[in-house]
Amino acid sequence: MEGEPFDRRLSRADMLRLAALAAGAGVVAGPTAAADAAVAHLTKESGRLQVMDWVGYVNDVPHHATYAAYLKKHPHNKPQFTHMASESDALGRFHAGAHPDLFRPYVGWVKYFAKSGLVQPWNPKLISNFKHLNPFMVKAGQYHGKQYGIPDDWGFDAILYRKDKVHPKARSWGLIFDDRYKGKIAWFDDIGMITVAGLYLKAKNPWNQTSAELDRSVNFLKKKIKLTKLLWAYESDLWQAFRGGDVWVAYAWPNDWVQMKKKFPVVYMHPREKPVAWVGMFMLLKGTPRPHLAHAYVDAWSSKHSGKWLEDNYGYGHANTQARPSSSQLLKALQLANPRAVTLPNAYLDRDIPQRALYAHLWEQVKASA
């Protein structure tokens, strides 16, 4: 793996300092411990680790296992969190001056951010759990042979519906466009809706549709958006609408199914056109002053223990292949034992959208037509 961008090259002055530190420490601890202590002293990073993450993942309480191991090793460096509503939202924040140490876009954005100059590759050698991560997902986080994304959580964009209220004609994305449920449908407020429309309408490549295909997808969405009750950006909004009976059918994620089945008889449908699979990818901001702390945080996220906790509490899959949830129902629903569950023939792994700016512009047109 190429690229260890922040592995510090020691200057002559550093070497002299290192020798002095090692000599002093060696009197007490021996040569190996002395060297470790000296390097640790030179690479010491200050300031709280800055993490930008999705709403719902930033529950910074001691029992939150996804970073409990990090807090155990760095008890005086509790991460400071900021929220992102989407990758586009994060990008806007970066351009406005935000500079967290790391953030977590999804796999379809890896190429975009790698090319943007905003991020730098990780050094997998500093992540002890890296060897346990799903190789297919690891490869999806690479660009030009460098590891720009570290995979952790994963799941599907699919359809959630109440089986006591909704009677699908087929296992299809068509359910979120079904005229019978006007006023009871929720879509995700994202350009991914254009991709899903392309899947449903059989575009050759829904992520890179031709002009004619885009016209068809966008016109279809403009017609069907009038069926919706809600365009959700935050899961809490979807849950509130679902719990209140305002929504019966939704474009949803596995965690939405986990939460809603506590109260309603719900089905998480695997559409015949296939769901869109996503993989969360931690990315390291270029020029971060805390690269080693960022690696420690991601290493904690990548552990078997963190993976099981995430699966049990959020209903998502985890890239650590050793992690298994307590629920056999979830194990089956996400096909967690299948290392290639996120790709064909089971699902389409989300990918780069070459015409991303155009898709975003067209999605705004769709919303304006409501």
Which residues does each predicted region cover?
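Mature extracytoplasmic/periplasmic domains
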Residues: 280, 285-347
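Paired acidic/hydrophobic, glycine-rich loop segments that form the ligand-binding mouth/hinge
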Residues: 101-104, 231, 248-253
